[in-house]
Amino acid sequence: MTERLKVVFQEKIAPKLIEKNRYKNKHQVPVIEKIVINRGLGNASQNTKILESSLNELTLIAGQRGVLTRSKKAIAAFKLREKTPVGVAVTLRGDRMYAFLDRLINLALPRIRDFQGINPKSFDGLGNYSLGLEEQLMFPEIDYDKIDQIRGMDISIITTAKKDSEGFQILKEFGMPFKE
């Protein structure tokens, strides 16, 4: 079964972008390539329970098991050894990516307290968008009673767009609630 946003993209958004930007064919239309959810855990090297619970939360949110990110080199000031776990990350592609984007736009972001929209200036110059969330409670999959600590996460939406304006257009068409 194909995801709702994937069908919306193929049937409504892509033709609209072809007409608006005067692309010669449908393959020139920028698409969302992947979504990367990352959570850095500074104190995870001392406590494996934090690491495990964070990995389970990201698995619930993304619908796919994450991987541990490890330190590349030792830093004595942070009591950090080389190759110790420092975070977790999940890369979503295909149907799972569209399912997560749908839940993010329609369920999670509206549940943020005092939500006014997300910052339209968080593009990287190549059409990719990054967004930081301060807590995981906005996702309906997370049970408030089962979390041990409120932790945030970084979400990067990587597109095939060449410019920020193209990336903005595609995310706006998907319904991303940008600030005016």
Swiss-Prot record:
UniProt gene name: rpl5
General function of this protein: Binds 5S rRNA, forms part of the central protuberance of the 50S subunit.
Signal sequence extent: none
The protein, known as: Large ribosomal subunit protein uL5c
Single GO biological process annotation from the record: translation
Native organism taxonomy: Eukaryota, Viridiplantae, Chlorophyta, Ulvophyceae, OUU clade
Keywords: Chloroplast, Plastid, Ribonucleoprotein, Ribosomal protein, RNA-binding, rRNA-binding
Gene Ontology MF terms in the entry: rRNA binding; structural constituent of ribosome
The protein's assembly and partners: Part of the 50S ribosomal subunit; contacts the 5S rRNA.
